[in-house]
Structures are given as structure tokens and as C-alpha cells.
Amino acid sequence: MSRDLPAGATPHTAQSVVNAVQGVAPAMEIADDRNADYTQLARLGLYLVADNAWNEGAMLGRFDTRWTRWLTTPEVSADDGLGRLRGEVFINGASVGGGQGRDLMGHPLKALAWLANEANARGEQLHAGDVCILGSLVSSKFPQQGDVLRFELESFEPIELTIT
């Protein structure tokens, strides 16, 4: 984040958070599901995200600070370049899923606005320097020791992680 996103007179929107984003990068989140009851996720999933409940860490690729070139429509849209950005995850060379930026609540900036508003509702805020993981293009995977995970996000260098 390039600047704080405090509560304001009106809620944050995808359009209003554009200037708060310093850069965009591919990421793989390391999660610990703590033996969760997956039947409850449909009801509680967004709150788990807002609470950072399962995050054990993340592997980040190179940040692109010229990311606004993907905003190819006058308003933030699922059809702009960021909404159409494609990514795919591989385990040991086999594809295990993929998606597009629009899979993150309709657009990554909509996910960021939601996160900022949720933080504000709790009396908190996103801060300059924060790194925000906004969602996933694939469902959770459960790699085993020795597996090699690779995330390929269009226009970025791939990132790779070996489970030891």
C-alpha cells in the first residue's frame, strides 16, 4: 500500500482505492487451516479472510509498480486488464487450477475495497506499507513433503516453492 485507507464519509470502492496501491505481485499464501470445519466456510469465509485467520505466511514475487497500465477501461471493470489477468498453479508440473483477476470478488480492487471497509468497521485501517493478499485463483491445495508448487501469473515471472 502506498498510503493509509482510513474510514471516510463514504465506504471505499474499487475506484477510490486505486491510488492507494503501490504495486501488484504474484503471491502464494501459506495457510494453516487448523482442522477447520469446511462445511461452515460458505458462511464464515469472508470473515476468516478479514481476520487473517489461517495465514502462516506468503511467498511474494516481484512487485510491478506500473500496474495501472492494466486499468484499460475508464472505470474499474472485470473486463479491464487487471480483471482479465490470468494465473495458474502447478504442483509437480501438473496444473491444479487457475483463474483470472475477476475471480477475486469481481475484481482485485473490489476485494481491496471490501478489505479496507471491513478493517474500518472494526476500528482499524490498512496502512501504507501493508501487503494485502486479496484472494485466490484456485481452491486450497494440500501439498506433501517434496512437492514443488509453481504459480504463473500472466506478465510476471513465475514463483516457485518446494515443500520440505
Give the role of each language-model region:
Residues 1-107, 158-164:
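Catalytic-core "active-site belt" of small-molecule-metabolizing enzymes
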Residues 108-140:
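A conserved acidic, glycine/proline-rich C-terminal tail/linker
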Residues 38-45, 49, 126, 136, ...:
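Short, surface-exposed, charged/polar-biased interaction segments
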Residues 91-93, 134, 154:
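Short strand-turn-strand beta-turns centered on an Asx-Gly dipeptide
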Residues 141-164:
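Charged, cofactor-coupling segments
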Residues 38-43, 60, 115, 132-133, ...:
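Short amphipathic alpha-helical surface micro-motifs
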Residues 23-27, 113-115, 121-125, 157-160:
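Glycine-rich loops and low-complexity Gly/Arg-rich segments
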